[in-house]
Amino acid sequence: MNWQFATAFGALMYFGCVIPLSAAEYEALRQKMVREVIAASGNSPPGASVVAAMEKVERHRFVPAWLSIFAYRNHPLPIGHGQTISQPLIVARMTELLKLKKDDKVLEIGTGSGYQAAVLAEIAKTVYTIEIIEPLGNEAAGRLQSLGYDNVKTRIGDGYYGWPEAAPFDAILVTAAASHVPPPLLKQLKPGGRMVVPLGAPFMTQYLMLVEKQPDGSVTTHQIVPVRFVPLRGGH
């Protein structure tokens, strides 16, 4: 977090003020954010479908109102209950790693504010998303419904165990750090499918991992980049 952002963030925290922006101003900030994400991606830029999704999804609708003017900064932001909305660069990277197709069925573990689910829903056919923190999950479900994401199915529950009755999934995205790849999720991943999951100890450096299930059922893993996520809660 740079000092200008920290200073402005602190001022909002102190005064509790909200500075409204117009739709055109938010649009301009969103386009700028996407350009910055592409530039920061280096040799691994997001593809056209991910770029289009992030250009469309209004991130300011997925953060607390008093943080809406910061929604298009390339930073994670608090969303309550000790959780955060991920940095846009990481959202783009994780989504790109899934290599989604328009007919795919995706499982997301950790709905949070619903932003990542909305990005996925702009690309895939159906998104199933699970949140263990009930108030957060209920807020996200209402938000996604109000924004017209009818292809997103939400549930309150322990994401470690996945969504067995909706399995198998073409892709699985875990938005909290686990100590290991959850076996129930691996079981629910289709042969030929991809899972993206951060692995590592809570609040320490973790690594974003790409897990690929081969057509014969064997599994390969690839370490992508160091990251820092809130810990996965629940059964694991």
From Swiss-Prot:
It is an enzyme of class 2 (transferase). CDD domains: AdoMet_MTases. Catalyzes the methyl esterification of L-isoaspartyl residues in peptides and proteins that result from spontaneous decomposition of normal L-aspartyl and L-asparaginyl residues. It plays a role in the repair and/or degradation of damaged proteins. GO terms for molecular function: protein-L-isoaspartate (D-aspartate) O-methyltransferase activity. It catalyses: [protein]-L-isoaspartate + S-adenosyl-L-methionine = [protein]-L-isoaspartate alpha-methyl ester + S-adenosyl-L-homocysteine. PROSITE patterns: PCMT. HAMAP family: PIMT. Its EC number is 2.1.1.77. One of its GO terms (cellular component) is cytoplasm. Belongs to the methyltransferase superfamily. L-isoaspartyl/D-aspartyl protein methyltransferase family. The active site is at 86. The gene is pcm1. It is found in: Cytoplasm. Its main location: cytoplasm. InterPro entries: PCMT, SAM-dependent_MTases_sf. PANTHER family: PROTEIN-L-ISOASPARTATE O-METHYLTRANSFERASE (PTHR11579), PROTEIN-L-ISOASPARTATE(D-ASPARTATE) O-METHYLTRANSFERASE (PTHR11579:SF0). It comes from Nitrosospira multiformis (strain ATCC 25196 / NCIMB 11849 / C 71). One of its GO terms (biological process) is protein repair. Keywords: Cytoplasm, Methyltransferase, S-adenosyl-L-methionine, Transferase. This is Protein-L-isoaspartate O-methyltransferase 1.
